[in-house]
């Protein structure tokens, strides 16, 4: 019998892409488990860092992970490869984002570290006006976002364990400014998470 290696993306493939309702369908869980029983290998292949690969995803059962857009590779519990952003480059980006009022987070395998105003901005985008709207508070209580609840606030943003850096748009600064400032050290990618707006 020929063994196969099958790679599964997470967002929009393995799980529903709406963060407030993220789940893995039972049919997918069954298919992955049956595939592995036949001797095939199943790997996650995702842009997510380990801290964003929640237990309900890992519990499906995978042989390994290619995560953080290729930033790390595991087989079982063994880390085969892990490329982190240099301290110098993290510091450069954090300084720029703080000086220019960006909302951002640092992705590491140990956590997702949020800038000061990121969580409140994401909650406004995801749920609505929590302070003044009962429907928004009800939505948050009934459909909490795995992503937002996993963000860690109040920690130093000058870290040595960063896989990737993600940010929300600052309407006062063109995206090209980010490319101009950081393309020497980063692949700067403009992307959209549908639930967080354009």
Regions found by a protein language model. Give the residues of each.
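A short acidic, helix-capping loop that chelates divalent metal ions and anchors anionic groups
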Residues: 14-18, 74-77, 196-198
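Conserved acidic, metal-coordinating active-site core of Asp-based
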Residues: 110-198
